[in-house]
Swiss-Prot record:
Highly glycosylated (N- and O-linked carbohydrates and sialic acid). The gene is IMPG1. Changing residue 786 to T: No effect on binding of hyaluronan or heparin. SMART domains: SEA. This is Interphotoreceptor matrix proteoglycan 1. It comes from Gallus gallus (Chicken). Glycans are attached at residues 143, 203, 212, 756, 780, 794, 812. PANTHER family: INTERPHOTORECEPTOR MATRIX PROTEOGLYCAN (PTHR12199), INTERPHOTORECEPTOR MATRIX PROTEOGLYCAN 1 (PTHR12199:SF3). One of its GO terms (cellular component) is photoreceptor outer segment. Gene3D superfamilies: SEA domain (3.30.70.960). Changing residue 785 to N: Reduces binding of hyaluronan and heparin. Chondroitin sulfate-, heparin- and hyaluronan-binding protein. May serve to form a basic macromolecular scaffold comprising the insoluble interphotoreceptor matrix. Residues 29-49, 164-182, 466-477 have a biased composition (Basic and acidic residues).
Length: 928
């Protein structure tokens, strides 16, 4: 029994041992399995993650590789719709091509020239303008390259050559790569807009393909050890000394006269500029010679003023006037009082501000013997795009190297923009004497389309109109060309050929015209008598072309019968044997340049030419011109009727010496007894077609009046019409956009000197408005080209002006100009002490404006407008004349001794000035 119990117990123990031994490996295997499972799971996760990561990168690469191009409207490739005709398919393909090209051109223009992404509206406006063929692709590039924003970017990057570097710059020893330079962000938008910093993208990569690009914050950028601006700011200017004649000693800085004059003016200038903030010192750079018209020479002094400043570039308050990006003034700024503006340190002023301070100080102190109208600054920060080469000249250089140049000879040339053909302005040349036949007329005159090619002009920095200046101001000096009149125009003379040597200072040689223009003139060739005729240059007033038509000889008897009751009065004995010079004013160009030529006619059978249309006709080509008045004796512009034998004609110029007309005096027989009949014969011969018949009351009044006709228009002048929308304004092909405007300054008093264009007050006020308005308009109006101050009129001071733009601008020109000028009025009132009445702004585009309205002619003059050029000017009424730009005055007042032998000068309305003898009889003496 015990044995059985022991065996059972032993069996149980063995069973327990076997069971325990089995459980231990099971647990071990289970743990290992669990560990293996965990390991395999992690490997699987790692492999899955890796595979997922690789797939994402590959997927991004594949997407970039096979990414479709941007196409907002059409898909790429040749797509054909079944319902379209072949013509429609071609048109749609061309339209799509134009769209894609314009999109890429505009996009690249913004990226290359402005280095920024365009706004949706401006991008769409440019694309639309390109699609309408308003601009070609290269014109878009030129427009962007000449924009103020692009020029400012270039100026800043040329000025600051050193780029800032990152603090977290990667070492070349660790990476073996190149140093990474942070490209400076340039804000080219309006002042009120904040643009994010854009970094350059590698070529071939689109901006919207960059994902998760990290940028270095602005705070991490290292501080540039080189100051952004110099410690001193220099302002250089030149001005003409009024009572100082130039001598050879002034060209030598070591001469006693040079030192004495320099010390004198340096001390005077220093007293004026001491009150300016930040003023340090002033230096006299030198003296230049300026030759006047009368042969005398004046002295131009060049100064340089130094102002102290720090190295930080701070935006000044004057930026509200000179740089307004979006045609708006930041009205949030609190306007500064005059006292606070005085306390502003020069360290916070830009070059423009300092120039304004210098100009203001010189205008306030009138003690200096200088001509403030000739004040000129150099290196101005804001200039027209055509003059930008002067601003960067000497700073950007291109090494000139090539196979033909040695390394030792290689030079550096300044980077300049291509400029138009310029004319040597060393002296004004005017043809003194000329002789012509009608057959030569065809080679000299072309149609209206040809006149543009007969002018060679240089682009002005400040547009002027030289034709309105007196003759003595029109001659630049020969050695140092001054900038008093920066626009030089060589007029195309229609009837000019030289027959004797001309004086260099009084003659000009026009450019030859193409002989193909002879098709515009139909002539009957016949021999022409050639008589030397000196040209007379006047103070220029615009006149309409005159049509002289030969009359039938059958009317001679009728004219004699009408005039038989008029007897001959008493005149000087010398006048019976010689002809008084009579001036006939001819317009030798269709455009109103004011370059009028006065010639006198002695005897001619007919004057058969018409100027003023595209086709010129001549039927009686026998023309003879006789001698005219010397240039130095002609003071007034003159237009008179055809000559009369044995009579005195009231001329608007001094008496003609008998020596000037020997041929004319000897050519006519003495027929004193038939003087009245000769008048009728000459009237028939001259063929003057009158527009008005003499009233019956005039037959017994002792006045005989002759009128020339208005020009006969052969070809109707083209109508001027601008295409204006909310987003663009376009002129006709070959035309410019012109806008007239006037504004009224209420805190200025008008003086009579502002009528005279040659007065110092007029020039000073004109220059002041040019310096204020020109930079403001350039920086705010795209396509702006030229500003011209037309005149000043009474009413406080009313400034009438004219602006010229490119043929197309991407905005409504009337609304844009009105907005810009309103902002200018507000800014001028806050910072320039100019009270401009914004409600008085009158802005009219040329296609809607009346140019005569802005000329503001007085009661003794009338406005004449050229129908082709739409240019207007004031012309004195018959019997009145203007001298030195002053308002028109009566000839009887200007020349008290106009009539001889006790005759009385009277003005006949609409007829002119006549001399009435004491016995109530008079010869015709009509002038206009």
């Amino acid at each position: 029994m015990h044995l059985k119990t022991g065996l059972i117990f032993l069996a149980i123990c063995l069973a327990l041992q076997v069971q325990g031994s089995r459980e231990i490996p099971s647990k071990t295997n289970h743990g290992e399995a669990k560990q293996l499972a965990d390991a395999s799971g992690s490997d699987k996760t790692e492999r899955t993650t890796k595979r997922s990561r690789v797939s994402t990168i590959r997927r991004i690469f594949d997407m970039a590789k096979h990414r479709t191009k941007r196409s907002p409207f059409f898909s790429t490739g040749v797509k054909i719709c079944p319902q379209e005709s072949v013509k429609q398919i071609l048109a749609s393909h061309q339209a799509y091509y134009r769209l894609r090209v314009c999109q890429e051109a505009v996009w690249e223009a913004f990226r290359i020239f402005l280095d920024r992404i365009p706004d949706t509206s401006e991008y769409q406006n440019w694309v639309t303008a390109c699609q309408r063929e308003t601009f070609c692709i290269f014109d878009i590039g030129k427009n962007f390259s000449n924009s103020q924003e692009h020029l400012e970017i270039i100026q800043r990057r040329v000025k600051h050559r050193t780029f800032q570097e990152r603090k977290d710059e990667i070492s070349t020893d660790k990476t073996g790569g190149k140093k990474l330079e942070d490209i400076p962000s340039v804000s080219t938008g309006p002042p009120s807009a904040s643009l994010s910093t854009y970094t350059l993208v590698p070529n071939g990569t689109l901006l919207n393909e960059i994902v998760n690009e990290t940028k270095t914050p602005v705070k991490e950028l290292g501080t540039n050890t080189v100051p952004e601006l110099p410690a001193e700011q220099m302002v250089e200017f030149s001005v003409t000394l009024t009572d100082q004649e130039y001598t050879a000693e002034l060209s030598d800085p070591n001469s006693p006269q040079y030192r004495q004059l320099a010390a004198k003016f340096q001390l005077q200038m220093q007293k004026i500029f001491e009150k300016l903030p930040g003023f340090k010192e002033i230096h006299v750079l030198g003296f230049k010679q300026k030759k006047e018209k009368d042969g005398s020479s004046s002295t131009i002094a060049r100064y340089m003023v130094n102002f102290e400043r720090d190295g930080s570039e701070i935006k000044s308050t004057a930026d509200d006037i000179s740089t307004i990006g979006s045609n708006k003034v930041e009205n949030e700024k609190v306007p500064l009082s005059a006292k606070e503006e005085r306390e502003i340190s020069a360290t916070k002023l830009t070059v423009t501000d300092l120039q304004q301070l210098v100009a203001t100080a010189l205008h306030e102190d009138r003690s200096l013997p200088v001509d403030l109208g000739t004040l000129r600054f150099t290196d101005e920060p804001i200039k027209p795009s055509s003059d930008f080469d002067n601003d960067i000249q000497g700073m950007v250089t291109i090494p000139l190297a090539g196979p033909d140049l040695d390394d030792t000879i290689s030079a550096e040339l300044p980077l300049v923009y291509p400029s138009p053909i310029t004319v040597d302005q060393t002296r004004d040349i005017f043809v003194d004497e000329f002789t012509t036949g009608i057959t030569d007329l065809s080679r000299e005159i072309g149609g209206p389309e040809d006149f543009d090619s007969n002018f060679i002009t240089s682009e002005p920095a400040f547009p002027t109109k030289p034709s309105r200046e007196p003759p003595h101001d029109r001659s630049p000096d020969t050695e140092d060309i001054t900038t008093d009149y920066q626009r030089f125009t060589v007029p195309f003379s229609a009837l000019v050929s030289t027959d004797s040597p001309a004086k260099p200072e009084d003659s000009y040689l026009p450019p030859p015209a193409d002989e193909s223009d002879s098709n515009d003139l139909i002539t009957d060739e016949s021999p022409t008598e050639q008589v030397i005729t000196p040209a007379v240059y006047t103070t220029g007033s615009f006149t309409l072309p005159t049509f002289l038509q030969a009359t039938d000889k059958d009317t001679e008897a009728e004219m004699k019968k009408e005039l038989v009751g008029v007897t001959e009065p008493l005149f000087k004995e010398a006048d019976r044997d010689s002809l008084s010079g009579q001036a006939v004013k001819m317009m030798d160009e269709l455009e109103s340049s004011g370059d009028d030529i006065l010639v006198t006619t002695s005897t001619y059978k007919t004057l058969p030419f018409l100027i003023g249309s595209s086709d010129l006709f001549a039927t009686q080509p026998e023309v003879t011109f006789a001698a005219a008045l010397p240039p130095d004796q002609t003071l007034l512009p003159t237009v008179t009727s055809p000559f009369y034998s044995h009579s005195v004609v009231i001329d608007q110029s001094p008496e003609v010496p008998d020596t000037l007309m020997p041929a004319a005096a000897s050519a006519l027989p003495d027929r004193a007894s038939t003087g009245v009949q000769d008048i009728a014969a000459e009237l028939d011969g001259a063929g003057v077609k009158s527009t008005a018949v003499l009233d019956e009351a005039e037959h017994g009044s002792g006045y005989i009046s002759v009128q020339t006709t208005e020009p006969a228009e052969v070809t109707q002048a083209p109508t001027l019409k601008y295409v204006t929308t909310s987003s663009m304004t376009t002129a006709a092909k070959g035309k410019e956009l012109v806008v007239f405007f006037s504004l009224r300054v209420t805190n200025m008093h008008f003086s009579d000197d502002l009528f005279n264009r040659s007065s110092q007050e007029y020039k000073a006020l004109e220059q002041q408005f040019m310096q204020l308005l020109l930079p403001y308009l350039q920086s705010n109006l795209t396509g702006f080209k030229q500003l011209e101050i037309l005149n000043f009129r009474n009413g406080s001071v009313i400034v009438n002006s004219k602006m010229k733009f490119a043929r197309t601008v991407p905005y409504n020109i009337t609304e844009a100009v009105h907005c810009v000028l309103e902002d200018f009025c507000d800014a001028a009132a806050q910072h320039l002490n100019l009270e401009i009445d914004s409600y008085s702004l009158d802005i009219e585009p040329a296609d809607q404006a009346d140019p005569c309205k802005f000329m503001a002619c007085d009661e003794f003059s009338k406005c004449i407008m050229n129908e082709w050029t739409k240019e207007a000017d004031c012309l004195c009424k018959p019997g009145y004349a203007s001298q030195d730009g002053l308002p028109c005055r009566s000839l009887c007042e200007m020349e008290p001794h106009l009539c001889d032998n006790g005759g009385k000068c009277e003005l006949v309305p609409g007829r002119g000035a006549v001399c009435r003898s004491p016995d109530q009889f008079t010869e015709p003496g009509l002038t206009s």
